[in-house]
Amino acid sequence: MEIGFMHNMLIYHGSNTAVENPRILVNGHYKDFGYGFYCTNIEKQAKRWALTRHGDSIVSRYQYTSNAQLKICQFSEMTEEWLQFVVECRSGIEHDYDIVEGPMADDQIWDYVEDYMAGKISKAAFWELVKFKYPTHQIVFCTERALETIHFEGSDIL
C-alpha cells in the first residue's frame, strides 16, 4: 500500500445513465473500498459494469486532475494489505482516505474473500485461486473534496 500521489488520467464509470455530476452514494451495500463514486482507468471494464445494469448501458468519461492535498491510498496489486483493507471495508469498517485506488474483487474474487473470512479456505488458498484472474482496476472517490478532482468529459451509449 502506498499513500500519496496519483497522476492525471482519463477514467470511466459504467452505469445505466450518464453521470455528469457524480455523487457519493451511501447505501447498505459495502464495496471493496467503502462508500464512494467508483471509476476505472480500463474502458473495457467500465463497459462490463455498464452492461450489467438494467436499462441503457452508458460509459461516462472523466478527466482526473491530481490534488496533493488529498489523502490517497493506492494498491498497485493484490497484496496482504489489500486483502485486509477489502475485508474491513466489506465488513463496514470506515477509513479516512479521500481516494482509494487498486485492483477490484469482482464477484468471483469476492466469493473467495467471503470463503477466507468464514474460515473455509486458508489465506494461501485464497492467493492461489486469485493469481490467474485478469487485471482489474478501480478508483473510488470517497469525499466531496475528492469529487472536485474529476471533470465530466462526455458519455457513450453502448
Predicted features, each with a name:
Residues 3-31, 35-40:
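Short N-terminal edge-element motif at the start of the domain
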Residues 2-7, 19, 31-32, 48, ...:
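Conserved NAD+-utilizing ADP-ribose enzyme module
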